[in-house]
Amino acid sequence: MVKEIKELTPKSVSSSRWYNDLVIKADLAENSAVRGCMVIKPYGYAIWEKIQRQLDEMFKETGHVNAYFPLFIPKSFLNREASHIEGFAKECAIVTHYRLKNDPIGKGIIVDSEAKLEEELIIRPTSESIIWNTYKKWIHSYRDLPILINQWANVVRWEMRTRLFLRTAEFLWQEGHTAHTSKEEAIEETLKILDIYANFVEQYMAIPVTKGVKTPCERFAGATDTYCIETLMQDGKALQAGTSHFLGQNFAKAFDVQFLNKKGKREYVWATSWGVSTRLMGALIMMHSDDNGLVLPPKLAPCQIVIIPVSKDRTSLEDINEKATNIINDFKNLDINVKYDNTDNKKPGWKFAEYELKGIPIRLTLGTRDLENGTIEVSRRDTLTKETISINNITDYANNLLNDIQQNIYQKALDYRSANTVYVDNYDEFKERIEEGGFIMAHWDGTAKTEEQIKKETKATIRCIPLNGDITPGIDMLTGMPSKQRVIFARAY
């Protein structure tokens, strides 16, 4: 049974199969009856709730409030911002009818042809259009601004090639939509959110990020500028973990959203939008986990510590239960999520493998001999090491160990990124190095033509122009034309 629990395809054999095995065997998610859509199982959803709760708190600390807007968007709304819809047109799911009926010749349920909608409805791929149509009703004066709204919702983008958490036809996310009186204020908002995302991913997910701006080719449809946080996964591929868009006045003009400024003149509103999704779950899984299962950062683990009793008989189990209860209460006083698994239908070895697979940061083993000696065994998931300590010190020790694990897995990820970031000046060398994965820092002449040629020939894209990168000018590795600074190239999810 233990072997069955831990049977994951090794990453060295296939990182793709390893990932899928892990998501399913760790009870995070599974494929549904609807192609491209997933069922997020309770354990996976508990992790998402931790992500959601912390981000929601960070948004509210900066003055944002939550609201909810319709799932359905009239098709005519999307026509108002042409470049915006162009970016999503091939992925849109469309509602054309509003009723079903029984087939008169007995072939089951069919669409009622007489129930065709006067205007087709798009199931939201993103909410800019429906929200800006609403903002037109809300915004009249500078006194109505700024509007700082976030919504937690699901969206649909009809992806053809799907993968659990990373790319699905329906996914969960948050999307922020703000309105401002000035360009400067909107840009400040865009960068503020970028910092929130970066801080969250680094401090809670324990994943180092690079903050940057997208090239025009990679920019969000309808945005003036798209800022992003880029991460590097263990398999050498990049993953975009979040985006924050400065929309300029594009949507305000498309939906005629104007306000009366302090001088009594009418002008268009300035806007931002920003979002992260359940794709963060994919990043969390891929970044830290190993062939034994999940490795979760303690700050996002639904269960941070599991206690497993090892008893010879029922009498000794009762003694262990009593001691474990005291330990649990001490942990709860420190707001540590702890589970005591004294179920008798599975052996300790099975439990060890199960909780290792699920990435519980710390496992405590408490046996009859431990009670006699006043000790307890402590196992940490990130290093798979164990030690025996005094049971009287376990609360403080484990609390400090959780912090150490959080820092250790971040440092491990940071070391990996550093070891897999290279500087390249020659295109032939670039084509060789891109096969090895990782971030490649190379000069780019700033043209879409060069960017597209490199993408076509190598499948590598410009992940971002780093905001805090080296701005030393140079020569484009492909064209020999002048370059303002190095950018990050990588193959990506």
UniProtKB/Swiss-Prot annotation:
Q: Where in the cell is it found?
A: Cytoplasm
- Classification via InterPro entries: aa-tRNA-synt_IIb (IPR002314), aa-tRNA-synth_II (IPR006195), aa-tRNA-synth_II/BPL/LPL (IPR045864), Anticodon-bd (IPR004154), Anticodon-bd_dom_sf (IPR036621), Pro-tRNA-ligase_IIa_arc-type (IPR004499), Pro-tRNA_ligase_II_C (IPR016061), Pro-tRNA_synth_II (IPR017449)
Q: What class of enzyme is it?
A: ligase
Q: Name the reaction it catalyses.
A: tRNA(Pro) + L-proline + ATP = L-prolyl-tRNA(Pro) + AMP + diphosphate
Which comment does the entry carry about domains? Consists of three domains: the N-terminal catalytic domain, the anticodon-binding domain and the C-terminal extension.
Write out the similarity annotation: Belongs to the class-II aminoacyl-tRNA synthetase family. ProS type 3 subfamily.
> What name does the UniProt record give this protein?
Proline--tRNA ligase
Q: Which organism is it from?
A: Azobacteroides pseudotrichonymphae genomovar. CFP2
| Lineage start | Bacteria, Pseudomonadati, Bacteroidota, Bacteroidia, Bacteroidales
